[in-house]
Amino acid sequence: MLKLLENMDVIVSAVPYEFNLTLTELAIKSKTSMVDLGGHTNIVRQQLSKNQEAISAGVTIVPDCGMGPGMNITMAVLATEILDKTDEIYICDGGLP
């Protein structure tokens, strides 16, 4: 996984929250910025405790940005910046149990 991340600028983690701390550590080690959907306060606190390591590695880690609202809106904004013209955006969110 580390070798794969070393070739990326940023990763978006949409996996179950149990993996986010490990992904944070790998992102810092590979000098790859990361954003995730979050889902568990204790995991997020552990990720935030790695802030100085991330700064030293020159990367940004954004934990717990959420799925909706959150990542879905961020991706919609990105799409409007890429497209020549946007009249409307419809966002559907399947939700998680």
Q: Positions of the model-derived regions?
A:
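Structural motif
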Residues: 14-15, 37, 64, 92
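ADP-ribose/adenylate-binding Rossmann-like module
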Residues: 16, 26-45
